[in-house]
Amino acid sequence: MKHNLLILLLFGLSLNLHSQIIENETKESINYLNDSISQINSNFKNKKYIPKSTDKIISRTEYLNKLYGFWLGECIANWTGLITEMDKIGNIGEIKTGNFYTRQDWGNPDLPSIWGEGLPSNLSPTIDFIFAEVDSIWGSDDDTDIEFIYQHLLHKNKTSMLTGEQIREGWLKHIKLEEENYLWVSNQKAFDLMNEGMLPPNTSLPKNNEHFEMIDAQLTTEIFGFFAPSRPDVALKMAKLPIQTTARENAEWISEFYVIMYSLASYVNENLSIKERILWMADEASKRLPKNSYASKMYDFVKNNYDLNIPWEQTRDALYKRYQVEQQDGYEITSQNIYCNGCFAAGINFGSSIISLLYGEGDLKSTIKIGTLAGWDSDNPTATWGGLLGFMIGKEGIEATFETKFSNKFNIHRTRINFPNNGIYTFNEMAKIGIEIIDRVVQEEMGGGVDFQKNVWYIPTIKLNIYEGK
């Protein structure tokens, strides 16, 4: 399961030969994608569309590869972050975890989490990347499985806009009622309410769900940004009800930030470096956060420290002090005296995620490392940014980054139930489903067109204007 840096030595290959192999495999992969994508959505009722000179043209073939990269990058980052999940949450209340991790802890022994009963992670004795090799299978987790369900529901119902009834039906069908069902805080409360007959968005109203400010929606809805490439306005419309299934107020705005980031990945100027793209996308997405919200103030606090070249560890420690110890800017989770001092809260985990996003500067490895070491619910930010960066560099970019091949199989039945083929899918199959969803979104929600001969989308461009959330 561990990344092996000795591949070139073991096989006695020169760097030039290795690069040539990667290049050849990339060409073969692209040819395969071109052959396979022509068969995607062949029964789609395509309306005649006359392209406009102002349309944004996006290749369906390239987007398929990017969606593959999303699922692969998300899995690598998710499982790596799981090693340190809830190892470090601070020293307030009954549960104290000592000093936070620093970059020096990478590669060193993992310490027990708050529920580890004194034992380190059973995933790895050390803090390091976790891989599913070619002949193995990635398992789903709560940072990937609800997104999988939403994609499935959009595809099954042949819609771009899920209803409360469709969300409730999907949750009840694919989530276990008892045993380990991999739901916590707001997700679990919303699920309980659905079992009682309640429909979203009522399942997140503060009067019904006391956990409305927890992390849940920001790990289950980012994918809607990819379903509306370069059009965050459409992405927010599609994601509104899924987000409001579990989140309100700051937790809702934070989730919308992530959705916008994912949509802007297809809008940003690709002539910029990936670092420049990430910084531009983050500043644009932050406009969604109301200026008087603690979410906005958290973003500004981390961004200011980053701009001042303050090391990420110091920024993380200052974030903890400012918001959990001193409860500044209206962040009053600590005074609520909830379990683990709100280690599942949307706010502190958002602040932590902005640290790994900005200081990672678009480098996949660095971003995952920082997210894994930053603390709290560490698998959530890593999964979110691993998915985003995996999308931006694609399958081949991920393989080149780690100089290895990965499994392309995914087992949704590790955490969810009642899917075909006993829950085993390939990333290519999952990406194809995404392409079919986007075909409908481009035509029905954007008023654009799909050209199956050229394998492109024509997306009407509008002025980018990110409004504050309400």
Regions found by a protein language model. Give the residues of each.
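Bacterial Sec-dependent N-terminal signal peptides
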Residues: 1-24
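Accessory "access/gating" subregions that flank catalytic or transport cores
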Residues: 43-45, 49-58, 190-212, 221-231, ...
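Mature, well-folded catalytic/scaffold domains that follow N-terminal targeting or propeptide regions
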Residues: 64-68, 194-205, 210-218, 227, ...
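Catalytic phosphate/nucleotide-handling subdomain of diverse soluble enzymes
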Residues: 76, 80-82, 86-108, 247-250, ...
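Active-site-surrounding "flap" and adjacent substrate/cofactor-binding loops of secreted or lumenal enzymes
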Residues: 83-131, 144-146, 168, 178-181
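Active-site cavity-forming subdomains of large catalytic enzyme subunits
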Residues: 133-134, 138-142, 146, 151-255
